[in-house]
Amino acid sequence: MNVLAKTPVMRITKIKDHIGAEVTGVDLTKPIDEETRQRLYDAAVDNVALVIRDQKFTPTQYANAARLFGELMEDQNRRYLAPGEPMVSTLSNHNKDSKGNQAKVAKAATWHTDHTNQEFPPKFTMLYAVELPDSGGGTGVCNMRDAYEALPDDLKARIDDMKTANTLISTVRMDIGNPDVLRDQQNAEGGPMIHPLVRTHPERGTKAIWFHTGKTEKILGMEPKETQEFLAELLEEAIKPEFSYVHEY
């Protein structure tokens, strides 16, 4: 008698009330139907952080899995690409800059939103761990939609119409930046990219706090130093344990 292997059933389980969901029972190296793809997409949008368990990717398989969530965006730093896959970048403390020194790319231990200096920043960031340190190396994510809603009304009213001027690396961080990135900044054409400090989600209509302290040159109407002080205070107000999830790979 032949016994057919059971097909795993994809399950999506919430991790915390305000953020995070865990996905099991799906292999993204294999084709999936549109209903499954849509469930994954909606879970990512609605839960902010989506943990998809038990995956094993080559760089190309990883890029194909990422395409399930939308069109891919090239990383602005083209120096540290995965072998044979131009749409996948590596974050590693083994990377070297053009002078042969350890590249300053690994210690991203500040709250930020990726690529705010781009006209069309990405909707999602996708991470896959290949090699881990003995300790540390987790990734923290915060639901800045719920964090925004929890702000005092007067602070929400104050930031609703604020706009930020964004560059590849802000002036106040020039002294700690990767020299190759600094050179890219100096050679960049055009002025800073202007974005709202509070963005409205195009599909859900929800508002969220949205900025990158390392790329925000200033809030329009403020000086750079005043901007950094204000953003630090805003993060202090917004980042709460109930809105945050730290993923340990």
Tell what function each PLM region has.
Residues N2-Y249:
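Non-heme Fe(II) oxygenase catalytic core, chiefly the N-lobe of the double-stranded beta-helix
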